[in-house]
């Protein structure tokens, strides 16, 4: 079977032809380069209308049009005008050639072409582009989003900064080139919230640094170091949460060599495999659309023309994945001398004055600039110790601190002989209620955890909260709303089958202790509506 795929979600027009055994017969793209900086959606759509006929003609010179068995197109997510042109061209081809048509999810297409062109089987995927920033993993018949941007995509961040300093579009390659000449680490915000990330503050600070007269090379270096360190960290956090044995990098920004270096170093530290597709398959392309179309069609997915309406807000986790029958992927292995290895720290069991204790050491991250890494590890070690002591004043169970060594970024704390809430919450929904109570008490006292997942609660005879490395004091309702969103998304991605029950019980516990819950939940809806893609 042979499929022709059409890609046109943003500024690239792509046509690809792929066989059912994965042979790419044709794959070519033409990028829209705006006369002025920035992409105009209408002009991008005009670009697709102009270039699709050229590419299709060229494709049919390589593969006879009568050999095509299926037409696939990017149904979303993306720019509405671009998607409409792409869908119209696909429908026209389908009707003209009298071949079936299928619309596919652009984000998932990146993952599947990555798996086709590498040895990855069941990877945790970091998808980074001008329009998307997501950490994705396959769990129970869907690709679940474990982390994503809370505002703009990383590629958009780079492009906006490039426009601000009058670099050509797309700005990423020019920033990468200038960054190689940078030496000074300019102080910029580092915004990680659980497995989520935000770039708006980073972008604004970089612009201000430019206005203040900092060398452009130093700003480009610092912008990359901060942005890519944040991306690598949330990938590592998702890796520790899912225990996948592989990481794959896809999307247009995957072409950046510094980002590749960082992720490779992180994967070596976690003893997992790292994959990146060939560069021609990293950015948007028609072959990835054709390949996903084949996977879906071969496994019984058909579409009528009425079903081919575009979906600009097409979330990755909206797609029922029927083409993955069995998972054979590797699992992350924790070294034998450790009882745990998180995204930030190695955890060893020990004894101290006849007490069972653990030593939590925030180890050096080889992927980060040494100056940035030193600051992050030291500040988070101090913060965690401070908040673990503080929350006891609110009646919240937490480990006892025996010693804090800031020079070596170590904390000695009491050992809790229990199980992670992640492993028992589905069979004991009272744990969800207790988590809600704990979070309600935190918010009542203006403490934001910033990394609420079911991996950061331990259930023994009581429920203990851990890992305040990202914690902060804030009386802002939006910070509390985002705290809940982080937890909600963690539950949705990890405990999807019991999500409704867990979330309902969590809210019952939260409401029972925090009288401002209505305000926070309403604001939570508002923040969620601002997300990049919502159903």
Curated annotation (Swiss-Prot):
It is found in: Cytoplasm. GO terms for biological process: tRNA threonylcarbamoyladenosine modification. GO terms for molecular function: ATP binding; iron ion binding; metalloendopeptidase activity; N(6)-L-threonylcarbamoyladenine synthase activity; protein serine kinase activity; protein serine/threonine kinase activity; protein serine/threonine/tyrosine kinase activity; zinc ion binding. The keyword Oxidoreductase does not apply. Binds 1 Fe(2+) ion per subunit. Its main location: cytoplasm. PROSITE patterns: GLYCOPROTEASE, PROTEIN_KINASE_DOM, PROTEIN_KINASE_TYR. L-threonylcarbamoyladenylate binds at residues 127-131, 159, 172, 176, 256. Its EC number is 2.3.1.234, 2.7.11.1. Its cofactor is Fe(2+). Activity provided by the Kae1 region seems to be regulated via phosphorylation by the protein kinase Bud32, which is itself activated by Cgi121. Keywords: Acyltransferase, ATP-binding, Cytoplasm, Iron, Kinase, Metal-binding, Multifunctional enzyme, Nucleotide-binding, Serine/threonine-protein kinase, Transferase, tRNA processing. CDD domains: ASKHA_NBD_Kae1_arch_bac. SUPFAM superfamilies: Actin-like ATPase domain (SSF53067), Protein kinase-like (PK-like) (SSF56112). The active site is at 451 (proton acceptor). In the N-terminal section; belongs to the KAE1 / TsaD family. In the C-terminal section; belongs to the protein kinase superfamily. Tyr protein kinase family. BUD32 subfamily. Required for the formation of a threonylcarbamoyl group on adenosine at position 37 (t(6)A37) in tRNAs that read codons beginning with adenine. Is a component of the KEOPS complex that is probably involved in the transfer of the threonylcarbamoyl moiety of threonylcarbamoyl-AMP (TC-AMP) to the N6 group of A37. The Kae1 domain likely plays a direct catalytic role in this reaction. The Bud32 domain probably displays kinase activity that regulates Kae1 function. In vitro, exhibits low ATPase activity, but does not bind DNA and does not have endonuclease activity. Component of the KEOPS complex that consists of Kae1, Bud32, Cgi121 and Pcc1; the whole complex dimerizes. This is Probable bifunctional tRNA threonylcarbamoyladenosine biosynthesis protein. It comes from Methanocaldococcus jannaschii (strain ATCC 43067 / DSM 2661 / JAL-1 / JCM 10045 / NBRC 100440).
């Amino acid at each position: 079977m042979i499929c022709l795929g059409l890609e046109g979600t943003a500024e690239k027009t792509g046509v690809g032809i792929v066989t059912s055994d994965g042979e790419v017969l044709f794959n070519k793209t033409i990028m829209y380069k705006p006369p002025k900086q920035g992409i105009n959606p209408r002009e991008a759509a005009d670009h697709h209308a102009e270039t699709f006929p050229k590419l299709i003609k060229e494709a049919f010179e390589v593969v006879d049009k009568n050999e095509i068995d299926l037409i696939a197109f990017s149904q979303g997510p993306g720019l509405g005008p671009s998607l409409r042109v792409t869908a119209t061209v696909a429908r026209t081809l389908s009707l003209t050639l009298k071949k079936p048509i299928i619309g596919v999810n652009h984000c998932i297409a990146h993952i599947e072409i990555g798996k086709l062109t590498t040895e990855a089987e069941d990877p945790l995927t970091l998808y980074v582009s001008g329009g998307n920033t997501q950490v994705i993993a396959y769990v129970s018949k869907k690709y679940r989003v474990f982390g994503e941007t809370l505002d703009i995509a990383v590629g958009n961040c780079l492009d906006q900064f490039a426009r601000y300093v009058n670099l050509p579009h797309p700005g990423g390659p020019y920033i990468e080139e200038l960054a190689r000449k940078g030496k000074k680490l300019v102080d910029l915000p580092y915004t990680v919230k659980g497995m989520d990330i935000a770039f708006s503050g980073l972008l604004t600070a970089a612009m201000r640094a430019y206005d203040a007269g900092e060398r452009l090379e130093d700003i480009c270096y610092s912008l990359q170091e901060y942005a890519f360190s944040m991306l690598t960290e949330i990938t590592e956090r998702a890796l520790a949460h899912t225990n996948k044995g592989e990481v794959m990098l896809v999307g247009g920004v995957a072409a950046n060599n510094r980002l590749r270096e960082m992720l490779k170093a992180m994967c070596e530290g976690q003893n997992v495999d790292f994959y990146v597709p060939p560069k021609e398959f990293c950015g948007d392309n028609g072959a990835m659309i054709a390949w996903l179309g084949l996977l879906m069609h071969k496994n019984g997915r058909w579409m009528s023309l009425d079903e081919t309406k575009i979906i600009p807000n097409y979330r990755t986790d909206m797609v029922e994945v029927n083409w993955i029958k069995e998972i054979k992927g590797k699992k992350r292995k924790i070294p034998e001398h450790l009882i745990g290895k998180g995204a930030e720290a190695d955890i060893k069991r020990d004894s101290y004055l006849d007490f069972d204790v653990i030593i939590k050491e925030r180890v050096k991250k080889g992927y980060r600039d040494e100056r940035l890494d030193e600051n992050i590890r030291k500040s988070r070690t101090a913060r965690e110790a401070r908040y673990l002591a503080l929350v006891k004043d609110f009646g919240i169970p937490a480990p006892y601190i025996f010693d804090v060594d800031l020079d070596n970024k170590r904390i000695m704390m009491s050992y809790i002989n229990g199980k992670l809430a992640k492993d028992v919450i589905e069979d004991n929904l009272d744990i969800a209620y207790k988590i809600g109570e704990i979070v309600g008490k935190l918010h009542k006292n203006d403490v934001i955890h910033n990394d609420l997942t079911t991996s950061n609660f331990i259930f023994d005879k009581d429920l203990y909260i851990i890992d305040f490395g990202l914690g902060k004091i804030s009386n802002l309702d939006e910070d509390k709303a985002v705290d809940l969103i982080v937890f909600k998304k963690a539950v949705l991605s990890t405990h999807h089958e019991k999500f409704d029950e867990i979330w309902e019980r969590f809210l019952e516990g939260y409401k029972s202790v925090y009288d401002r819950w209505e305000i926070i939940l309403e604001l939570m809806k508002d923040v969620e509506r601002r997300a990049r893609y919502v159903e």
